[in-house]
């Protein structure tokens, strides 16, 4: 099941681990940016990712790609369709889309989440694990996970889309370091920015100044339900605040 994702994109997770894309079912084994690899460019150009591309070319069955496989079997659109349609004419690997989760820092404790994506869950996940509840893949190794934000040596000349996630990305100031790199390299105006946020806060002035520099921004307001049910689903959720911030995004000048 060939997919062009490994030729055009990479995702760096909260703990420095990497995946070809957000649909990939698991993390690539024994890969950590800042530990086994200096930066994402070193991994992107390295033998491990080249081997992964060859497996794609050979149409091997890759366990982590099960989501797109199931979508295809059921006649549904998939991320693979997105990559293959958008980048059908590419010839050489280059980082054209980048997905970054720099930490698990979050101000919500949602019932569908875990400590890997929200440090608010760490104490509970740890306690449940100690009581014998299997939290494999959910309990983070420590309360605060951080992923490197150093873009030195990373070739971003072909970048057209940057996705930032969390945790809650709008409370992670290190994303501003990424924006500054794009500005200094004079490419920020060529890049579309995608933000997935719980919409509990609105960006401050410093954030706004950077946001206006991007070619386009897409804001995904993450919500499970509204009103009292929303507050039950997501500890920290405030319907009134959500509505106010939604209006501010609608009127945000770009």
Please state what every model-predicted region is.
Residues 1-84:
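Accessory C-terminal segments flanking Radical SAM cores
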Residues 66-67, 108-112:
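C-type cytochrome heme c attachment motif
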Residues 70-71, 113-119:
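Detector for the c-type heme attachment site
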Residues 179, 207-211, 243-250:
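Generic structural signal for well-ordered alpha-helices
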Residues 181-186, 252:
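Short, acidic, metal-binding catalytic loop of nucleotide-sugar glycosyltransferases
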């Amino acid at each position: 099941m060939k997919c062009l994702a490994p030729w055009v994109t990479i995702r760096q997770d909260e703990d420095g681990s990497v995946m070809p894309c957000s649909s990939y079912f698991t993390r690539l084994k024994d890969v950590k940016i800042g530990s086994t690899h200096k930066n994402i460019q070193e991994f992107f150009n390295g033998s491990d990712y080249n081997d992964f591309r060859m497996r794609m070319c050979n149409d091997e069955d890759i366990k982590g790609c099960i989501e797109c496989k199931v979508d295809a079997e059921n006649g549904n659109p998939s991320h693979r369709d997105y990559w293959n349609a958008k980048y059908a004419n590419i010839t050489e690997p280059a980082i054209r889309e980048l997905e970054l989760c720099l930490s698990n820092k979050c101000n919500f404790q949602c019932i569908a989440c875990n400590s890997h994506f929200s440090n608010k869950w760490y104490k509970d996940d740890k306690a449940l694990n100690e009581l014998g509840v299997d939290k494999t893949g959910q309990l983070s190794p420590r309360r605060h996970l951080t992923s490197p934000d150093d873009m030195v040596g990373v070739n971003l000349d072909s970048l057209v889309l940057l996705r930032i996630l969390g945790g809650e990305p709008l409370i992670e100031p290190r994303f501003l370091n990424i924006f500054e790199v794009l500005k200094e390299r004079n490419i920020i105006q060529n890049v579309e920015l995608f933000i997935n946020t719980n919409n509990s806060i609105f960006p401050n002035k410093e954030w706004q100044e950077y946001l206006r520099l991007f070619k386009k921004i897409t804001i995904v307001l993450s919500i499970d339900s509204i009103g009292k049910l929303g507050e039950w689903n997501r500890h920290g959720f405030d319907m009134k605040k959500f509505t106010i911030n939604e209006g501010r995004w609608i009127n945000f000048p770009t």
